[in-house]
């Protein structure tokens, strides 16, 4: 084991446990660094707090992406590939570790939709919690202390060597990606590839949501991003209509209207979803609101009202036929015979069983759905 090596950083001490190979990698901005780590206390037992090998997958961070535990970027950029080193880090560098650890543990347990990595937006809301949900982490948060990190550097990928996920992009790259994703979603929608289109819209929404967390709510830039997000959500909802996921459409559109009650397209899309699940009164109320806010949409509203009327008539006819079938089934069943006294039996014969009562089949499936005209394609009055 080499003697302790001091990095040019206050409160950090490094000891190389196993030498690496080759030259020091070129850690340029956007490089992906893959590594295993073990975090320990500085007590006599060297109590293990976290160990990525126990999770079964290595961790990775992106250089220059404002990783919350900034000291890790400093530690990793001092290492060669396959090097194993131990780093002692003073309290000035470890105060945020309990919050990071909580996020890592939740991901390992499958509670977070992302994989075994951490990024800024995933940590932004952690400070709102009074407890982290883990006793050892609560203790660390109340009483920050120096920690030891044992790190094995596995791989360093240049930005051009891997496909960067949306969250890996810089703020500028995210903003540039949004119109590209939006346009690709519109193209796929027109081709009838609704699943792929919805994925593009979702990816663009994630970019904008991440950018929005960096702005002060309800100020100019925040509202600009909010408008873009709502447009994309409504495009996404049109994909959901095509996929017959009507209740999710109702959820998204209602959420938009709770915060922005003047968005005409949200009322229109919600009206169509209400119509598909036979919420006649709600659909008509939303269509009236569309006309109130945008009289020029009278033609589209009349068309939706006709479709709604036809849909409700079909449903009523289906219900009428179902009731008639149930009544006719009951009429064809033989009447139950009146009970009679059983004949005298000897003590050795068992008593006669009573005849089973006739039963009518009462269960029925949901009413059949009716076809609807497709929504205006992206790029027209309902989609930007």
Swiss-Prot record:
Keywords: Cytoplasm, Nucleus, Repeat, TPR repeat
SMART domains for this protein: TPR
Entry's Gene Ontology cellular component terms: cytoplasm; nucleus
SUPFAM superfamilies assigned: FKBP-like (SSF54534), TPR-like (SSF48452)
Ranges for the TPR repeats: 178-211, 230-263, 264-297
Composition bias type Low complexity, residue spans: 359-372
GO molecular function, one term: peptidyl-prolyl cis-trans isomerase activity
Domain PPIase FKBP-type: 53-145
Major localization class: cytoplasm
Entry's localization field: Cytoplasm; Nucleus
Region spans: Disordered: 328-384
Any matching Pfam family: PPIase_AIP
Function: May be important in protein trafficking and/or protein folding and stabilization.
Subunit relationships: Interacts with NUB1.
Official protein name in the record: Aryl-hydrocarbon-interacting protein-like 1
Organism listed in the record: Pan paniscus
């Amino acid at each position: 084991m080499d003697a302790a090596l001091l990095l040019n950083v206050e409160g950090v001490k490094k000891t190389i446990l196993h030498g690496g190979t080759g030259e020091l990698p070129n850690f340029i901005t956007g490089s992906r660094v893959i590594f295993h780590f073990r975090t320990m206390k500085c007590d006599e037992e060297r109590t293990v707090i976290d160990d990525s090998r126990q999770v079964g997958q290595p961790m990775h961070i992106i250089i220059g992406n404002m990783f919350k535990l900034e000291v890790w970027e400093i530690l990793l950029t001092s290492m060669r590939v396959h090097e194993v080193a131990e780093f002692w880090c003073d309290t000035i560098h470890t105060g945020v570790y309990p919050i990071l650890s909580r996020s890592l543990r939740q991901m390992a347990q499958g509670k977070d939709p992302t994989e075994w990595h951490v990024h800024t937006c995933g940590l932004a809301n952690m400070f709102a919690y009074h407890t982290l949900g883990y006793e050892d982490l609560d203790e660390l948060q109340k009483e920050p202390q120096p920690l030891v990190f044992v790190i094995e550097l596995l791989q360093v990928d240049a930005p051009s060597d891997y496909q960067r996920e949306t969250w890996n992009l810089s703020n500028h790259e995210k903003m540039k990606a949004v119109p590209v994703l939006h346009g690709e979603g519109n193209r796929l929608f027109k081709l009838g590839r609704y699943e792929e289109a919805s994925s593009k819209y979702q990816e663009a929404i994630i970019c904008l949501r991440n950018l929005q967390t960096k702005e002060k709510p309800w100020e100019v830039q925040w509202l600009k991003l909010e408008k873009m997000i709502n447009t994309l959500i409504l495009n996404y909802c049109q994909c959901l209509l095509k996929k017959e996921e009507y209740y999710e459409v109702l959820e998204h559109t209602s959420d938009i209207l709770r915060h922005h009650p003047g968005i005409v397209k949200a009322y229109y899309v919600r009206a169509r979803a209400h119509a598909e699940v036979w919420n006649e009164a709600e659909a008509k109320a939303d269509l009236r609101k569309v006309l109130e806010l945008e009289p020029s949409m009278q033609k589209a509203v009349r068309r939706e009202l006709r479709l709604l009327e036809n849909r409700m008539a079909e449903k009523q006819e289906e219900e009428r036929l179902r009731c008639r079938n149930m009544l006719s089934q009951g009429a064809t069943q033989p009447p139950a015979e009146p009970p009679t006294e059983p004949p005298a039996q000897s003590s050795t014969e068992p008593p006669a069983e009573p005849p089973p009562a006739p039963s009518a089949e009462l269960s029925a499936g949901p009413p059949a759905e009716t076809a609807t005209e497709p929504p205006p394609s992206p790029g027209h009055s309902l989609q930007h």
